[in-house]
A protein has these predicted regions:
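Alpha-helical membrane-protein topology signature
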Residues: 1-179
Length: 179
């Protein structure tokens, strides 16, 4: 079962990386929904292998999959205010579900990471989103280490490096344009 758990995690990482190569926001959200569902399965299997803190990862990935589906369904009629309200509602849902599945302080790492990611989705400025990703990735990475989530660790490391690279590249381009 450990092999299957890790396979789902690595598959989720591949879907995550691939999602950002897709053309439309809607396609990205569908891919992220699949990614969250694969990570949900990954953490469920890790939980069944004895990683008791993996329950929080499983549950919070379920909340994120639901969040992404809601964003897809409301995409055309969503205002900026509605996006903010959804971010607050899903941040509260992450906190509540995180508290309900709490098994140790390790759970707090993933709760923080997922709240930061949920807030990031409501910010239209790409470099600010990248900063939130860089802040949340170490929390999720540490959670993944404690739960032996190979796919999760790879995903967070690549996400952090990708966000950092883009942040520095676009920041530098902005300075060159201003000069």
């Amino acid at each position: 079962m450990e092999f299957a758990a890790q396979a789902f995690g690595i598959l989720a990482f591949i879907v995550s990386v691939t999602s950002f190569q897709l053309k439309t926001y809607r396609q990205i959200l569908w891919a992220q929904t699949l990614c969250a569902t694969l990570f949900l399965t990954h953490f469920l299997l890790l939980y069944r292998c004895g990683q008791t803190d993996a329950m929080t990862g499983m549950a919070l990935n379920g909340v994120c999959a639901l969040r992404d589906v809601v964003l897809i369904l409301t995409e055309k009629k969503r205002t900026q205010q509605m996006t903010r309200l959804l971010a607050v509602a899903f941040s509260l849902a992450v906190a509540l579900v995180g508290i309900l599945t709490w098994t140790s302080p390790v759970s707090l790492l993933f709760i923080i990471a997922m709240i930061l990611n949920t807030v990031a989705m409501s910010i239209p400025e790409p470099n600010t989103v990248r900063v939130f990703i860089m802040i949340s990735a170490p929390f999720a990475f540490a959670y993944d280490v404690f739960n032996h989530s190979i796919g999760g660790m790879i995903n967070e490391a690549v996400s952090f490096l990708s966000a950092l690279t883009a942040f520095l590249r676009y920041r530098r381009k902005g300075k060159e344009t201003a000069a």
